[in-house]
């Protein structure tokens, strides 16, 4: 296929953190008249919705982690099957460029593309390069990064190929970014949003309702809480909020309009995945960020530190994320509107709303340069 009528293969794991930036890029590429095919794993069936691709192919994948040698061996066998399937897909499509968004589901299609001499572009959303991207980086044509700071974990010989584009965000996020920060009056209404990423987070359901119940009664009476909670945690969260004397509350397993709910919030409590951090920055909302613990790479801690250093967020390790500590944080922040307003402005200043367009331009440039060699 020629660059004049290009096809771009996107590879992304089937979670929101990987799919959202891929979706944003796909929309920009489609606007340029470029055909997009998405390669992903079976999880996409629950999260992809109407992904803007002319074709979606599911490729076997697994993560070779854990202590069990048997489990790791089985994962490697699955990845091998995925690689064989990916070779067939890449040969059939003959893409101008293959773009990977991290996670082990991207390894088979990107490795197949590299072996077939298709130009490959990696997008690293986090402040620490993931293991899959690090494995693929040596053979990548170019590496796009979501953060301006030096990304840790990039192989030394691949560092010269880095380009900072920012993290692409969905159209719904760009629409929400047009909403000004809500006014903060001394006795006026307050809105708190709590969520744990596209997969939810139990710790939010364990800590946030208990913390809200500890707030002063006058503060609770002004407060509306919107929280994403896992289905098994809904009843408990609703019961606690129902007894707290709040102005209003809403608890659900998933919010399709989450960007709009971010825009309506005075303060957000969330994990610090790359997409969440990028969306908070583009919309311009202050947040208490609780990085996911236990990660070998500590990527969420690094992401939270980026916004924290900008004055846009208040990072809290999960060991310190207790009802008592969160109640103190909420009381202090809601009692100091100037801190929230300053953090909102700092978040807005850290956002890159045109990241999808920057990345699309880099994809096209990569295809053109490859075609002229």
From Swiss-Prot:
<feature type="binding site">
    <location>
        <begin position="15"/>
        <end position="17"/>
    </location>
    <ligand>
        <name>UDP-N-acetyl-alpha-D-glucosamine</name>
    </ligand>
</feature>
<feature type="binding site">
    <location>
        <position position="198"/>
    </location>
    <ligand>
        <name>UDP-N-acetyl-alpha-D-glucosamine</name>
    </ligand>
</feature>
<keyword id="KW-0328">Glycosyltransferase</keyword>
<dbReference type="GO" id="GO:0008360">
    <property type="term" value="P:regulation of cell shape"/>
</dbReference>
<keyword id="KW-0132">Cell division</keyword>
<comment type="pathway">
    <text>Cell wall biogenesis; peptidoglycan biosynthesis.</text>
</comment>
<dbReference type="GO" id="GO:0005886">
    <property type="term" value="C:plasma membrane"/>
</dbReference>
<feature type="binding site">
    <location>
        <position position="170"/>
    </location>
    <ligand>
        <name>UDP-N-acetyl-alpha-D-glucosamine</name>
    </ligand>
</feature>
<keyword id="KW-0997">Cell inner membrane</keyword>
<keyword id="KW-0472">Membrane</keyword>
<feature type="binding site">
    <location>
        <position position="300"/>
    </location>
    <ligand>
        <name>UDP-N-acetyl-alpha-D-glucosamine</name>
    </ligand>
</feature>
<keyword id="KW-0133">Cell shape</keyword>
<keyword id="KW-0573">Peptidoglycan synthesis</keyword>
<dbReference type="Pfam" id="PF04101">
    <property type="entry name" value="Glyco_tran_28_C"/>
</dbReference>
<dbReference type="InterPro" id="IPR006009">
    <property type="entry name" value="GlcNAc_MurG"/>
</dbReference>
<protein>
    <recommendedName>
        <fullName>UDP-N-acetylglucosamine--N-acetylmuramyl-(pentapeptide) pyrophosphoryl-undecaprenol N-acetylglucosamine transferase</fullName>
        <ecNumber>2.4.1.227</ecNumber>
    </recommendedName>
</protein>
<keyword id="KW-0961">Cell wall biogenesis/degradation</keyword>
<comment type="function">
    <text>Cell wall formation. Catalyzes the transfer of a GlcNAc subunit on undecaprenyl-pyrophosphoryl-MurNAc-pentapeptide (lipid intermediate I) to form undecaprenyl-pyrophosphoryl-MurNAc-(pentapeptide)GlcNAc (lipid intermediate II).</text>
</comment>
<dbReference type="GO" id="GO:0050511">
    <property type="term" value="F:undecaprenyldiphospho-muramoylpentapeptide beta-N-acetylglucosaminyltransferase activity"/>
</dbReference>
<keyword id="KW-1003">Cell membrane</keyword>
<dbReference type="GO" id="GO:0030259">
    <property type="term" value="P:lipid glycosylation"/>
</dbReference>
<dbReference type="InterPro" id="IPR007235">
    <property type="entry name" value="Glyco_trans_28_C"/>
</dbReference>
<dbReference type="Pfam" id="PF03033">
    <property type="entry name" value="Glyco_transf_28"/>
</dbReference>
<dbReference type="GO" id="GO:0051301">
    <property type="term" value="P:cell division"/>
</dbReference>
<dbReference type="GO" id="GO:0051991">
    <property type="term" value="F:UDP-N-acetyl-D-glucosamine:N-acetylmuramoyl-L-alanyl-D-glutamyl-meso-2,6-diaminopimelyl-D-alanyl-D-alanine-diphosphoundecaprenol 4-beta-N-acetylglucosaminlytransferase activity"/>
</dbReference>
<dbReference type="GO" id="GO:0071555">
    <property type="term" value="P:cell wall organization"/>
</dbReference>
<keyword id="KW-0808">Transferase</keyword>
<dbReference type="GO" id="GO:0005975">
    <property type="term" value="P:carbohydrate metabolic process"/>
</dbReference>
<comment type="similarity">
    <text>Belongs to the glycosyltransferase 28 family. MurG subfamily.</text>
</comment>
<dbReference type="GO" id="GO:0009252">
    <property type="term" value="P:peptidoglycan biosynthetic process"/>
</dbReference>
<feature type="binding site">
    <location>
        <position position="126"/>
    </location>
    <ligand>
        <name>UDP-N-acetyl-alpha-D-glucosamine</name>
    </ligand>
</feature>
<dbReference type="InterPro" id="IPR004276">
    <property type="entry name" value="GlycoTrans_28_N"/>
</dbReference>
<keyword id="KW-0131">Cell cycle</keyword>
